[in-house]
Amino acid sequence: MKLTRGLFLLMFLGRMNASAFAAEKLIADYGGHAGFQSATWIGRDLRIFEKHGLDVEIVMITGAARSVAALLGNSTHFATGSATGPLAAAVRGSDLKVLAASYNKFPYAFVVKPEIRNPKELRGKRVNILNYGGSNDLALQLALKEWGMKLSDVQVIIGGDAPTRMGALMSGRIDATILSPPHLTIVAKAGYRILADMGDMSANFTQSSLYVKGSSLKENRDRVKRFLRGYAEAIHVIKTDRVRTMKVFANRMRIDDPETVRTTYEYFAPRFSFPPRVNLDGVRDTINFYAEQNPDFKNRKPEEFVDQSLMDELDKEGFFKKLGQ
């Protein structure tokens, strides 16, 4: 009888321990199948988040507005994407904070039909972007501004993720679009003209950021910190582990051509930010740009939208230094 009770107690305690150490289930989004959006893929597919006690499901949500809506509606716990979405929502009163950024430059190139030889020949042409208010929109407007043109000088076509826009360009339904590898690599090989690499533009930009609801940061700070650890470790893997990263790239991007996978990796890996701190100049440039059109952005400071306190904690604890050893 005593033996039976002892076995029952051991089984009960075993279940308690398994439950206590079970990974916490969370949902994070990613914006598409381009290399700059890969931090969450790597964290999930290489089981990095599990090392930090998290069972993370990742879902694709295209467009900043949809990503913000999913986060505010509690459909996701963490959102990733350009800072335009959380900034635009925050100036309207939404409780959002940008915590980190894996990519602090535009990753795009402006691609056109071969017969378009310079920016002035874009006048009246059909330019396809994902949506208004996102990084595609801002990249287009900043490029036109550098070329001395206005948005009204072109026909803006809205809709379509990167593969869809690539297909529209190659089928002749549009004249120009904004792409990054691997889609940029494919169209360049096919003879389409790269009019400008937006990474070379003077403007800084928080392209791939990690953001959460401010209430989550306060109420679930440890959980958010563990996710940030996994996110940062995934970025470190991208920059240092070519073989494993390229396998994930090939799978997630559905690319069979090893050369395209290689060029995509070589384009993005050096440009990732590690540690993934937000470049406040990029946030400031975005605020200043939107302030010309929206008075809500006037006299606002990056620090109102960005909270890097967890980044500071991880830095102080030596987390980033340990990953680099």
Residue spans for each PLM region:
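Pocket-lining segment of extracytoplasmic ligand-binding domains
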Residues: 84-85, 157, 163-254
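Bacterial N-terminal signal peptides that target proteins for export
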Residues: 1-8
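Sec/Tat signal peptide C-region and signal peptidase I cleavage site
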Residues: 17-22
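Secondary-structure end/capping motifs
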Residues: 218-299
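Ligand-binding clefts/hinges and TM-proximal coupling segments of bilobed small-molecule sensing domains
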Residues: 134-150, 154, 229-260, 303-306, ...
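Conserved C-terminal helix/tail region of periplasmic/extracytoplasmic solute-binding proteins
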Residues: 288-325
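Hydrophobic helical h-region of N-terminal Sec-dependent signal peptides
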Residues: 8-12, 16
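Short, glycine-/small- and polar/acidic-enriched structural segments
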Residues: 23-171, 175-181, 194-198, 203-204
